[in-house]
Curated annotation (Swiss-Prot):
A GO molecular-function descriptor: aspartic acid methylthiotransferase activity
Gene Ontology CC annotations of this record: cytosol
Pfam family, one: UPF0004
Protein name as it appears in the record: Ribosomal protein uS12 methylthiotransferase RimO
Reaction it catalyzes: L-aspartate(89)-[ribosomal protein uS12]-hydrogen + (sulfur carrier)-SH + AH2 + 2 S-adenosyl-L-methionine = 3-methylsulfanyl-L-aspartate(89)-[ribosomal protein uS12]-hydrogen + (sulfur carrier)-H + 5'-deoxyadenosine + L-methionine + A + S-adenosyl-L-homocysteine + 2 H(+)
Binding-site residues, [4Fe-4S] cluster 1: C17, C53, C82
GO biological process, one term: tRNA modification
Amino acid sequence: MSKVTPQPKIGFVSLGCPKNLVDSERILTELRTEGYDVVPSYDDADMVIVNTCGFIDSAVQESLEAIGEALNENGKVIVTGCLGAKEDQIREVHPKVLEITGPHSYEQVLEHVHHYVPKPKHNPFLSLVPEQGVKLTPRHYAYLKISEGCNHRCTFCIIPSMRGDLVSRPIGEVLSEAKRLVDAGVKEILVISQDTSAYGVDVKHRTGFHNGKPVKTSMVSLCEQLSKLGIWTRLHYVYPYPHVDDVIPLMAEGKILPYLDIPLQHASPRILKLMKRPGSVDRQLARIKQWREICPELTLRSTFIVGFPGETEEDFQMLLDFLKEARLDRVGCFKYSPVEGADANALPDQVPEEVKEERWNRFMQLQQQISAERLQEKVGREILVIIDEVDEEGAIGRSMADAPEIDGAVYLNGETNVKPGDILRVKVEHADEYDLWGSRV
C-alpha cells in the first residue's frame, strides 16, 4: 500500500487595501492549484507569506509588526506586497526574512515557495480549486481588479514608485473573470484599481474581444458589459476625468449601481496644485449638480486630506465650504502623514500635529451632520438591501449606497429567515449618522 505524502502547508497574512486582497487571492489560487494546503495558523505552516501594505506610516508599522509576529511564531517567512518594494527598510528591522518581493510579483513569490517548500506531487483533479479561484471575501461579493499601477504623480502618494505606471488588463480577460464570479454565486462585483477611470488609457482604448465580439478597452464599455451580468456593479477609485460623466446615465438606467467613489482630496485650488490634483472646485460642484440631476439616486463617496503641508486656515475653510455645498453622502478623512519617498515631504510649512487633529475633528463633525441629514431623507422610503450577515437577532445588510467595510449598514432586527447574498426590499424606519434600520416589505 503506497504511503500518502502530506500536503505542504502555507500560512498567509494579507494586509492593506482591496487591491492587495486581490493579489493575495491570486497567489493563494496558484498555491492551491499546485497542491499546497493553506492553513489558518502559524503552528501548522511549513512557511508563512506576508502580503504587506506600505502606503502610509501606520500601514508600514502594521506590516512590520505582522512580519515580526510571523517570524516569532513560525520562523520561515516570505514578504511580498507594497512594503516589499522597500527591501532595505524590512531587512533593517527583520534581517531573518527569507525572501522579499515587491507588489504583483506572483511568479517570484511562487518560485521562492518552491525553493523552500518544494512543490508537492499531487493529482490536480483533487485540488478542488473553484473555477473563480480562491476568494477571501464572502461568497456573495468579490473585487474585480481591472488594472495595475497609476500614471498620476500626486505628491502625497508613492504608489507609482511601488506598483509602476498604469497597465490595464485585457478587457476580455476581465469580463471572463466577472462571468466566472457570477457563475459561482457572486451577487455584487466591486471594480477596483489604482485609477479605474483611466482603464484602457495605456493601450489607447484598443478593441479587445469577449465571446468573439469586439469590446473597447474603456471604463464605459466595461460598465456596459458588466451590466449584462444581472448583478450589482460598484465602481471604486474613480479619478474625476471628463468621461466619468458618461457612466452617470448607465447608473440612471439601473445598469450599474448609482454609486461613485471619487477621491477629491481637497477643495482649495492652491492645495490641490501642491498635491498635483485637478484644481477647479467650481467645475467639480457643477458636475456633481449635473450628475444628481441625471441620476437623483446617486451616492457620492470621497476621501480628503487635512493638514497637508502649506494648508492655511483659509484653505481649510474652503474645504468646509465645499462639504456644505457638495453634501456628499459618504466621506473619509485622513490627517496628512509623511510617507517615505513622497514629494510632499519636501514642501515647506508643515502643519503642526495639534492643528491637523483640530481640523480633522471640525471636518468630521460637519460631515457627520451632513451624513445624518442625507440618511434622514431615506426614512419612510423603500430601498434594496443585500444581506451580509444573519444571526438569531436578525440580519445586517447594505443598501446600494453602501460598499462593504467602508460605508454604513442596514439593520433588520428579527429578520432571521434570510441568508447572505439575498437581496430584499426594505422600508427604512430609522437613521443615524451612518446606518439605517428597517423592515422587509
